[in-house]
A protein has these predicted regions:
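Active-site helical microenvironments for divalent-metal-assisted chemistry
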Residues: 2-185
Length: 185
């Protein structure tokens, strides 16, 4: 839904509808970290990061940021996202969704391969997602992840971000700042 000049209320309603849908779909999920915070916190953080980097209103992009894990993690179809929200939102979510039928190593490899071919808007979601995940690794790492595994995740996340063809400069600076904290692990 493209924002009209006096359509802030509709945009807010659309965002809240997406946030509620994401919250309901991810209700049973917790973050992997020791704090086991509700998964919706991650989705809200990704959307907030994208919002801070925008230079214009893009409600669909923010909705896609909120919904970016609904297909991959809880099986919401692209068709359902298109029906409930819009084809644009569904397409953005699809761009950042891994194929769960593949093994984890292949999914990770393909994120690097596909990164430069995604739209600029999808790249914003991708980098914001990586920022959020790295922040979690620093602030509340999963108890069952060794230091080596966390460092490998940081390295892989950097490979994905470095492969992006047009990373948003605000998000790239934020990513670089959190990546530098790798030495703090």
């Amino acid at each position: 839904m493209i924002d009209q000049p006096n359509n802030a209320l509709t945009a807010a309603q659309d965002l809240l509808r997406a946030a509620r849908f994401a919250s309901e779909k991810h209700a049973a999920q917790r973050r992997k970290g020791a704090s086991a915070e509700p998964y919706i916190n991650h989705l809200l953080e990704v959307a907030e990061l994208v919002a801070t980097a925008l230079d214009h209103a893009d409600t669909n992009l923010l909705m896609a940021a909120l919904l970016h894990d609904t297909s991959e993690d809880v099986g919401v179809t692209k068709e359902e996202l298109a029906t409930r929200f819009s084809a644009d939102v569904a397409n953005l979510v699809a761009e950042v969704t891994d194929d769960k039928s593949l093994d984890k190593a292949e999914r990770k490899r393909l994120q690097i391969v596909h990164a430069p071919h995604t739209s600029i808007r999808a790249q914003m979601i991708k980098i914001a997602d990586k920022i959020s995940n790295l922040r979690s690794m620093v602030n509340s790492p999963p108890a069952d992840w060794s230091l080596q595994r966390r460092r490998e995740y940081f390295t892989w996340a950097k490979q994905v971000v470095d492969a992006l063809s047009s990373p948003n400069p605000i998000l790239k600076a934020e990513f670089d700042a959190i990546y530098r904290r790798l030495k703090d692990l």
